[in-house]
């Protein structure tokens, strides 16, 4: 989760720069326990470095935080100014289960003797209420393609923010199509059209969002079916236009973020080019190929 200044949990000047695009929050089922851990709509801020921080709603566009790794959940204060000391996870058991399910489906389909579904089921049972987990598994077992599509979604939901989604999409040859899909979804969200038409214009919250409470927040207006009419009656002290920012400069910034989700064809420019400083220092050994 983003920290704007040094505070009661960290002496780093900032943290939590990267975050999900806002449509990811709405891709999750509302009862998926991973949603509110992964997609966090607030940041920690304060008036001055070293002050006690409080929660503030972050920008819808370019402001969400990934919430799986949080200074405020650690049992020590990060007292270094340049290193948080966290050990980054390389592989989780969920990755092994979903890889097994994917591999078996490719070899045997969803109804083969090795039972790809049992590995998928373990992830679904942990994430959803029993009835929804069963329904998703039944949908997946309808065909090999259906099972693959569920795997694509579940790996998104399970590993968002863990730096493996891009390589998954590359190996499936889906990077370009999913990036296009993201632009289209974000445009519909900005216009509150299609699957986002029932979202309210504003979010409603209290000043400070429960202050230093590190484990929860109260905010109305994020979910499908929330309305501005109800939000105005709930007694929150603050509200703000969020999906479509009120200020024209913020509107322009949001549209620019959508447009710049990618500049080059993702399927032909999948990786960073080699930086010029490394090429210059390689004694002619390194070059950028493939039209970089």
Where are these regions (language model features)?
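Short, solvent-exposed loop/turn and secondary-structure capping segments
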Residues: 37, 48-50, 134-135, 162-164
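Extended amphipathic alpha-helical segments enriched in small hydrophobics
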Residues: 85-130
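Intrinsically disordered or highly flexible coil/loop and linker segments, enriched in small
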Residues: 44, 129-133, 157-161
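Hydrophobic face of alpha-helices
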Residues: 36, 117-120, 152
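Elongated scaffold/linker segments in the mid-to-C-terminal portions of large proteins
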Residues: 1-99, 106, 172-292
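Stable alpha-helical elements in mature extracytoplasmic
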Residues: 116-119, 143, 147
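Cytochrome P450 fold signature focused on the C-terminal beta-domain
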Residues: 132-141
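Acidic/serine-rich, low-complexity amphipathic helices located in mid- to C-terminal regulatory regions
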Residues: 144-183
């Amino acid at each position: 989760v983003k920290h704007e200044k040094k505070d009661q949990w960290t002496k780093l000047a900032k943290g939590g720069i990267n975050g999900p695009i806002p449509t990811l929050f709405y891709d999750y089922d509302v009862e998926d326990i991973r949603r509110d851990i992964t997609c966090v709509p607030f940041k920690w801020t304060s008036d001055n470095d070293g002050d006690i921080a409080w929660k503030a709603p972050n920008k819808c566009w370019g402001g969400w935080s990934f919430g799986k790794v949080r200074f405020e959940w650690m049992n020590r204060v990060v007292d270094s100014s340049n290193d948080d000391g966290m050990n980054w996870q390389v592989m989780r058991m969920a990755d092994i289960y979903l890889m097994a399910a994917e591999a078996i489906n490719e070899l045997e389909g969803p109804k083969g003797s090795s039972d790809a579904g049992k590995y998928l089921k373990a992830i679904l049972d942990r994430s959803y209420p029993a009835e929804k987990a069963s329904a998703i598994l039944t949908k997946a077992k309808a065909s090999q393609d259906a099972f693959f599509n569920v795997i694509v979604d579940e790996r998104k939901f399970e590993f968002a923010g863990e730096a493996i989604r891009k390589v998954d999409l590359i190996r499936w040859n889906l990077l370009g199509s999913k990036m296009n899909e993201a632009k289209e979804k974000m445009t519909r969200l900005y216009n509150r059209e299609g699957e986002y038409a029932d979202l309210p214009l504003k979010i409603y919250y209290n000043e400070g969002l429960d202050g230093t409470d590190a484990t929860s927040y109260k905010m109305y207006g994020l979910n499908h079916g929330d309305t501005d009419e109800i939000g105005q009656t709930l007694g929150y002290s603050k509200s703000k236009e969020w999906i479509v920012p009120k200020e024209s400069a913020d509107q322009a910034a949001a549209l620019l973020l959508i447009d710049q989700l990618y500049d080059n064809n993702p399927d032909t420019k999948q990786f960073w080019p080699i930086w010029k400083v490394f090429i210059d220092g390689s004694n002619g050994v390194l070059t950028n190929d493939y039209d970089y």
